[in-house]
Amino acid sequence: MENTTVINIYCADKFFQTTYSTIKKCNFLTSKLIDNEIRLNIDPIHIEYLLNYLRGYLLDELCMEKIGYMIDVLPNHITINVGGKYYYLDRDFLCEYLEYFKVFTEYNKHLDPDYSSVLIDRSYVMFDKILEYNQKSTNIELYNFIKQELEFYLFKKEHLTNNQISSETKRQSIELSELPISKITNYEFIKYITKKTKTGNIVYKSIHENHYYHYCNSKILTHENTIILIKLNGSNIEQLLHNIVSFKRDYCDHTKQEDITISKLFQKKIAVHDKSNNLIIMDIELNDKDITIDFNYFNDGSVYIFHPINLINSEKTFFKKICKRVCQTITCRHNINMVKINITDFIEKITCNREKCVYIFDKIYFVIPNHNVSINYVELISSDFGNLTTSELLPSKTNPNKFMIKTLQTANKNIRFNICVDAIHRYSRNYLEIYYDLKQPVNTDINIMYKYHIIKQSY
C-alpha cells in the first residue's frame, strides 16, 4: 500500500481521515485495516489522541494513559476484547482478580500482549461494572447486579480481601492434581472450593457450575471419566469402606455387572480420602457407551458427581489434557518429490469427535527407510489461505532417517505450530495439508509419528 493512500476511520458516530504513512507502524490500526477502512467500537476521543500521537504531537501523561492499550507503552499490560470493546489492563490484576484470565492468557499466550483478536463474547457494559466493583467491593447492590457475570469470570467474593486472595480461601481450596492418586494427576482443571453454610457444614461446589450434578441413586453416564465426591457427615469412614459400587454395563443382548468395594478402590488408587476435609474423591474411567453406576451408600453423607462435557470453546477454561503418541504410515506408490498429507486424516485416526476438542501436535517425526532421502522443507497449506507456514527439518542424531520439525516461520499469527486443529477448522473449511518437499523422489513407506495432546473444554 502506498504511503499516500487515504485511510478512512469510522469510530462510533465520528469520522477520521489520515494517510497510510501515519498509521503503518501502529499494529492496533493496521491489523483492522480492510479496503482502506478501519471500523472501531471505542471512544472517538481516544482515536483523536492516537492519530495526533502518530503525527508527532506531544501529548500529556493523561492522554498517553488513555491510548496506552493501542501503542503498548505500559509494562505488563495486555489488551483484551470484551464484546467488541478493547481494554488495556494490568496482567497481574486481571489474573488475580478474575481467574478466567489465568487460563485465557495461558491458552492464547502466542498472542501476548495483544489478545484483542480473540473476542470474549460478553457484555462490555457488565465488564465495566466488574471493574467498578473492584473499586467499590463493599457495594452489595452492585455485586448482586453483576453476580452472574462475576461467576463467568471465575470470581468468588470470598476470595478477595483488599484485592488479595485470602489465606482462608487458600486453606479451604483443594487442587486435585496435588492428591496422591495416579489418574487424577491428569485433571489439571478441577478445583473444588469449600463454602461454609448457615448450618456450619461444608458444601463442595465446582467452579464450573454448569457441570456440577447431584447424584441420585443411579445415573446413565456416557463420558470417559467421572469424578465422584463423597462428603462424609461423620468422621467414621470404616463403614463406608465396605460399601459396594456397582457398575452395570449395558450391551445388546445382556447386561454385565461388576461390584467393587470402596476399600478396593482405595487399594487400586482409584480413590483417595482427604482427611482434613472429610472427603472421598474417586476417579472412575468409563470406556463403555452406556453405563449405570449404583452407589450403595447407607446415608453416610452426600454424594456428588462431576464429569466433563467435551465441547470446544476457545474462550473458556481448560478441561483436561491427554497426551498420546501415534505412528501412521504413508505409502508413496510412485516416484514423487512432494508428499501431501491432509491433517484432518490424522484426526480421523484419533477420534470421530474432533470438532469437540482441541488437538495440539507437540512433535511430528518422519522416518524414511531410504538412507539417501532427505527433506528440504515442510509447508502447511490451507485450501482457503494458501501457504500458512514453512519449516526446516532437523535430522535425528540417533537415526539419520528420522526427521523432526525444528522451526516454522508463521505467516498468520493465528496459526501456530504446534498444529492446533481448532485453528485449522477456523482457517480452512475444506482441507489443510502438510507438504513435504523431498530432495530425491521416493517410492517407499514413510512413517509419520506424532505426539499430541487433547484439550477438552467447558462451555
From Swiss-Prot:
InterPro entries: BTB/POZ_dom, SKP1/BTB/POZ_sf, T1-type_BTB. Residues 76-143 form the BTB domain. Pfam families: BTB_2. One of its GO terms (biological process) is protein homooligomerization. It comes from the Viruses. Belongs to the mimivirus BTB/WD family. This is Putative BTB/POZ domain-containing protein R541. It comes from Acanthamoeba polyphaga mimivirus.
